[in-house]
């Protein structure tokens, strides 16, 4: 077996099948599929650090899977996860180092990572010694990274920065920014590969090794469609796979989990005559009907003057037709709670300026709002984009106080909204529950 199977993070959270079982189903499947290593992404902390650390320990005890992250430290400065792992193939040794994004500090609820630090700039400027150590013990060095390639400010430390500033890395297997690199990219002497999002692709890197030296590197992607008919794909050409049959044991496990899940998710709660837009590129750049509906549900459930929630918390659209409980959980998978805080008019302006600051680029913190009318110019300088804000047709008084409904993630300063980190006046219901009640009230079939 000369294959190395890796995942670049955010693997344990995001689908209903995963979320309702707190990531357990994915852990079982990773083991069944023979994964060698994963790096924690920001969403892998969504069930809390203790559960992730426990899962890593269980994986190490009972399987070959390793959870790798060199830059996640506890309060004493000790590494929480194993920093790297060596793999030998007929004497050819591959070293794999894990690197989690420092963005996690603002991309999951603070309570999920309490006591942890992610070394931030040290990921770039302090990692040379670790790479040198692994380089001495191996013939090929891979960084398994949940860092991303965005250069628009939404991602701080990028894999490209790693490649440019650290010597000795042969390959970076990257995640976080959902970037699709069909044949990878070369930065300095380092290859970077990234396979997009949501299992639309499987990334493959073929290494040709002669006398313990890599003489050729060929990265490519295999689409989901090609897996269904691999005879004409790169799988057939380079890996020799011409047909893919479902693994009976894996399929049986998935079917059993889906059966349990169906008891919850197939319940129809409402009907929509229009598509409710929650696509990533939409909710992170503009108001959408689904984003506005969620914010309106938050406002109505708390009696707030206005509501604001982050577009990055909306994870899917809802098509025309019946709306099931499962679809709502898929749209809002983070188990967030609606909270009520008191803010000033200036806080509202500051929050909106911050939320609109990265346009036209996508931003998980883009505000989906209700109860206010916003006049803005995306072409104005950052910090001067919000021209007017009206509540009930009246200009917002910057010195007055208002009740604002948001989610507990943002009320803790999540996504960088430090101006909303205010004492909570009221803890409401779960965000998915609030949306469900709104749909039942206004869109009951």
Feature-to-residue mapping (PLM):
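Short N-terminal signal/transit or membrane-insertion segments
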Residues: 16-37, 144-152, 235-262, 329-343, ...
């Amino acid at each position: 077996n000369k294959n190395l199977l890796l995942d670049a993070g955010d693997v344990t959270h995001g689908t209903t099948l995963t979320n309702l079982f707190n990531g357990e189903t994915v852990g079982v499947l990773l083991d069944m599929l023979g994964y060698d290593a994963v790096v924690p992404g920001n969403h892998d902390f969504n069930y809390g650090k203790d559960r992730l650390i426990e899962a890593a320990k269980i994986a190490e005890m009972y399987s070959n899977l390793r959870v790798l992250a060199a830059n996640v430290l506890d309060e004493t400065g000790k590494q929480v996860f194993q920093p790297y792992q060596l793999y030998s193939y007929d004497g050819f040794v591959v070293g794999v180092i894990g690197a989690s994004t420092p963005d996690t500090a603002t991309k999951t609820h603070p309570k999920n990572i309490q006591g942890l630090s992610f070394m931030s700039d040290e990921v770039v400027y302090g990692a040379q010694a670790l790479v040198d150590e692994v380089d001495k013990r191996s013939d090929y060095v891979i960084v398994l990274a949940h860092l991303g390639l965005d250069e628009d400010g939404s991602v701080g430390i990028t894999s490209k920065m790693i490649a440019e500033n650290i010597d000795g890395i042969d390959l970076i297997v990257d995640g976080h920014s959902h970037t699709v690199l069909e044949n990878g990219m070369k930065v300095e002497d380092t290859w970077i590969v990234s396979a997009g999002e949501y299992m639309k692709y499987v990334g493959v890197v073929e290494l040709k090794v002669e006398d313990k030296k890599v003489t050729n590197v060929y990265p490519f992607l295999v689409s989901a469609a090609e897996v269904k008919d691999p005879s004409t794909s790169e799988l057939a050409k380079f890996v020799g796979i011409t047909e893919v049959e479902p693994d009976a044991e894996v399929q049986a496990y998935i079917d059993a989990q889906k059966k349990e899940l169906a008891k919850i998710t197939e319940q129809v709660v409402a009907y929509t005559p229009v598509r409710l837009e929650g696509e990533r590129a939409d909710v992170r750049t503009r108001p959408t009907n689904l984003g506005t509906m969620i914010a309106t549900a938050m406002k109505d459930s708390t009696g707030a003057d206005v509501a604001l929630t982050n577009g990055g918390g909306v994870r899917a659209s809802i098509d025309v037709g019946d709306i099931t409980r499962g679809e709502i959980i898929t749209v809002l998978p983070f188990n967030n709670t609606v909270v009520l805080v008191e803010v000033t008019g200036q806080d509202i302006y500051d929050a909106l300026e911050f939320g609109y600051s990265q346009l036209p680029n996508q931003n998980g913190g883009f505000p989906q709002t209700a109860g206010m009318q916003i006049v803005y110019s995306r072409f104005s300088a950052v910090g001067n984009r919000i021209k007017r804000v009206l509540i009930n047709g009246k200009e917002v008084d910057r010195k007055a106080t208002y009740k604002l409904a948001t989610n507990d993630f943002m009320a803790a300063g999540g996504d960088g909204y430090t101006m909303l980190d205010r004492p909570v006046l009221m803890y409401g219901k779960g965000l998915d529950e609030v949306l469900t009640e709104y749909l039942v009230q206004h869109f009951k079939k």
